[in-house]
Amino acid sequence: MKRFLIASSLAASAMALAAPSLAQDKAPAPAAAQDPQFSQPYIDVDEWRDAPVRHRYVHGGFKGTETLFSFYFPDKAHYQGRFFQHITPVPDNENLAQKMPMGEENKIGFSIASGAYFIETNGGGRDQVGMPGKPNDFTLAAYRANAAAARYSRVVALQMYGGKRPYGYAFGGSGGGFRTVGSIENTEGVWDGVVPYVLGSPMAPPNLFSIRLRAMRILNDKFPQILDAVEPGGSGDPYAGLTPEQASVLREATKMGFPTPSWFGWKTMGIHGFAALYGGMLQADAGYFTDFWSKPGYLGHDDPKVFDGYRLQYDSGVATPITALEAAQAKLNVSIVNGTKNGGVDNAFAALQGEEGRRIVAFRLTGAPPPVYFDGGDLIVQSGAAAGKRLTIARINDDIVILGVVDAAVAAQIKAGDTVRVDNSNFLAAETYHWHQVPPASDNYPEWDQFRTADGKPIYPQRAFLLGPLFTAATTGKPFGQPPMTGRFHGKMILVENLWDREAMPWQGDWYRKRVEANLGAATNDNFRIWMTDHALHGDSAQQEDPTRTVSYLGVLQQALRDLSLWVEKGVAPPANTDYRVEDGQVIVPATAAARRGIQPVATVSANGGVKAVVKVGQPVHFTAKIDVPSGTGKIVSAEWDFEGAGTFPVKAKLPAPGARVVLSVSHAFSKPGIYFPALRVASERDGNAASPYARIQNLGRVRVVVE
């Protein structure tokens, strides 16, 4: 596949596309070579706007391509010579930032408050999504479209502000983390540094979703007791009371890196990104799904009875197709994600659904499939214009099958009267795909050692190739057959991972760190940091799934960008790496802020002196909290109590002057019996600015109270 490699030695005047030659930094970054496919930029909107703050909005694209961009420039008084560029998980929309509310989530407001202009693009266009087997040049979406926008933004910025070459920093999470890493590894002189976050590894897709599918099905009714064991004041033994099969599945998922406390979302988290990966998986390795049920060494062949009561093969007819407009009118939820599609890491893949009102999103069948546990399947068309085709089913609602990520043209061919089969056989087969994807031991994936014999050989038959690296290469823009992520880059990087992340298990950040260390050696500490965020999930949004359990990590990302710019521009080293160890797939951090390091505060809460208190109705419980910030990383600016699980944190603690250590004490009585998990949410800010909505680093402390 043809690739345009980004060179590192072209003069700045050539990059500037006929812009005037301007003085550069004393030690300038290498100039970014012009990509010939993006040689004709144009601007179709150029205007000043007042929301969320005063800025100049510039929209345009590149002739001969589908790439579109938006630039958001502050006035000269607020510009400090840099830009921040967000990279979405998949090619999306260049106007996403305009839809974000005021406050912490607003990328335009944050960038301008940080002296930067902001860049976003459509990633080259929706048609450029990288998947194995797609005919398009996946380097466009991986990094070239974003690089072209970054290069051209400097032309516009220099014309507006004059002065020196703007420094540039990119950030992106999940699939956008892959694209961010690919961007810095494949180029030189475009970005001076990057902040990838919730980053996976080349072995992540689809394997870290397949183990999740299996665990969700087999442990479905056991999660309440598993969670109770690992909650504050619990037994600490999540395996107690499980059958041998259930214990084996939980142990397997845990060793693969799934954070046990994060199973609290078992009812709502669904299959997540597997909805987008399944189509590529089926295209690249279709034989697996027949081998699974027909060949020795595969669970479906060797022990098919374990799927009794779960396997669904239901023949029916189509009563009527349902369009997106009709679904909305009937208040039928057909989204494959919870919440709004805004390019965030928890929902960007849903953009692949499309949005047109006439798009077919579901079918009403002539009968309702029998009720079984169902986390996805196929609608196999047996007659009509689409005979022989299959569409992914996200879920079943009585006699309505709701589609997942599908080919809209195929869905439109299916008419009333066509015969179809609802079949979840492939999704059941996918549950153990990771058994048959054991990487070489030299690739440093100890999480797969559980699928090897004592002499290091795979226990199960292996597929002809490893699928994960193919998916990843299509996202990072590396040639197939070469390492998708090398750890070799020019610039500086701060990597942010989350300890409760159930989509990108945090051990993968350590995997990439080892790649960086192998390439940079003694220079690693001068160019790389990794920060782990406790109580944080995958999604990059201010509102998290359960606020009494989890916190937003947006403040960590924002501080990482600010620290990165100081590191590059002024030589000010950022705070140290989080101290951690990886043990059986789990990332474990020290209990105190001083030992943990990184930038996140640590809140230690007690109830009547312990992690668990047992009291009578109306009897006051005495809560104490010690809050510490790692040295030199900020001051505590807020502390909020939520005693009864409302998720609103209604009790605001009165703080002394902002400081790096705070001790709190409060009492609360419960009016009803039950089990409560009171939580204290705290936030630090680098300068102790309690009024700023940005770069507030959050954490939680929790205890258990049993009221009799």
Provide a role label for each language-model segment.
Residues 692-708:
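Short beta-strand elements
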Residues 1-22:
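Gram-negative bacterial Sec-dependent N-terminal signal peptides
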Residues 24-640, 646-696:
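C-terminal His-loop and adjacent cap/lid subdomain of alpha/beta-hydrolase
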